[in-house]
């Protein structure tokens, strides 16, 4: 089975269609596979094509009466939520997938064989080969075969590659007024270089220089003036506002973000974070040596940033506090390897910074008189 179609198709999550003629067993296959995918920690959405139309409500119920009166209906219950739209306000397949991709790990499409989506084709008992006009078939599952095993084997090989094929950017979180440090952290010097310059170099070396973006406002070292820059959304406050700006700018991308107060971060730390990407893992937040999580030098998938914006909106002050990042679903908090652990050490006062410089011999102490 080929993996040549590894891409996201603009929907924020990997998409795979399961196609075949009526009676080929598409629903039976998905019904058996979905519990296995969920057991692996994946959030799965299915978009089903029904060419004959369907009824999903009971005639005479309040919701059905309001729908037939011309309204779009949204029903909310303790265990499920449902939306019913009429023909005039229905969503396209593309928009439906884009919306579902915000909070799911895998999007499966049953049917829609005439689309450009990558497809698994299911042979039927009497009709097997797909019509010539059906494109994007990546594999065919014969009728008399263990199709569930073949489907799961394909997903296990394809999904990690598709997940990691989504763009990965580096975001340098700029400091505010620099109350504790005396100046904004990005321009504070450490060993003859600005902290912002040190962290930006780590991001650029660990990813690609053109994928490093400045997040936030404030003065800059001259060496960073050429980097792309995103302003914080005016309706949000707090250090997470920069992540919201990043997600709105590139909603399909994952981000490794780094604050300017990590003087020990290097490309190896960024590469280690990037290597932690897994389907179903929305965020990776490393621990410092003392066990405290460090959300300001971490990895966030687009689903995580979508969830973070919802959490920040729930705050009366729209404060995107760093602690909000710890509440993102499907977040892995883990201890980095010992040889990398110092990368998550941060400095918050001029005294801490000078002590680190002196410890490493980066400054010359005046001679005693």
Report residues per predicted region.
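Charged phosphate-binding loop/patch that engages nucleotide di/tri-phosphates or the phosphate backbone
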Residues: 144-167, 331, 342-368
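Glycine/small-residue-rich pyrophosphate-binding loop that anchors the diphosphate of NDP-sugar donors
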Residues: 28, 296-297, 322, 343-344
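Short internal beta-strands
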Residues: 46-48, 75-77, 137, 213-216, ...
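Phosphate-binding/switch loop-helix module in NTP-utilizing enzymes
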Residues: 85-115
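Nucleotide and nucleotide-moiety/phosphate-recognizing core
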Residues: 37, 51, 61, 67-70, ...
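Walker A (P-loop) phosphate-binding motif
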Residues: 2-52, 166-171
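Phosphate/Mg2+-binding loops and adjacent switch elements
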Residues: 106-163
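N-terminal phosphate/diphosphate-binding loop that engages ATP/GTP or pyrophosphate donors
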Residues: 34-91
